Amino acid sequence: MNFTGQRYWLVGASEGLGRALAHKMSAAGAELVISARSETRLLELADELPNKAQVIALDLSDGVSVAKAGADLGRLDGVVFVAGVYWPMSANQWDGANAVAMAEINFTGAFRVLDQVMPQFLERDSGHIVITGSLSGFRGLPGAIGYGASKAGVMSLAESLYADLRTSGIKVQVANPGFIETR
């Protein structure tokens, strides 16, 4: 795919799949806005990329942090939400704090990011939204209560966006990868 002349916000860019996508998209001509929690990792990544990249550190569990990031975005052609956290948790080892944290980042974080881009996409009737779900969002898996539930929510969000926007100029995609070892 050729991204020449296009500006994308890549959320969850500091490591793993997000970092790999940043390299691929930049090599394909995209000007990126890269976001994640670690500004240090983002600055290192920006230095590695062949095209210009704006660094905006944020915390997806904090609505104020995401809104502040949104204020610095400018015009975008698309957003790729690949951020996510996973902490193994079975029903027998219930950890409510970790379950809520996964939902805050993986699911609510997607809403917060979309809140920053949807107004401009709707105004122009143009944009590209890519949201990363997971194969674990299709059905329950052992040891993945918080993660699987949050990814099922993200997948439903993407499908609902697609249903509402499919006849518009806004393209919506969901990617549901299997297990990817990122650390």
Regions found by a protein language model. Give the residues of each.
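Active-site loop immediately N-terminal to the catalytic Tyr-X3-Lys motif
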Residues: 92, 141-145
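Alpha-helical segment proximal to the catalytic Tyr-Lys
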Residues: 119, 163-164
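Conserved glycine-rich Rossmann-like NAD(P)H-binding loop of the short-chain dehydrogenase/reductase
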Residues: 30-45
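Residue(s) in the substrate-gating loop at a strand-loop-helix junction
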Residues: 134
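Substrate-binding pocket helix/loop in short-chain dehydrogenase/reductase
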Residues: 90-92, 98-103
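Active-site helix of classical SDR
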Residues: 114, 150
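Conserved glycine-rich cofactor-binding loop
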Residues: 14-15
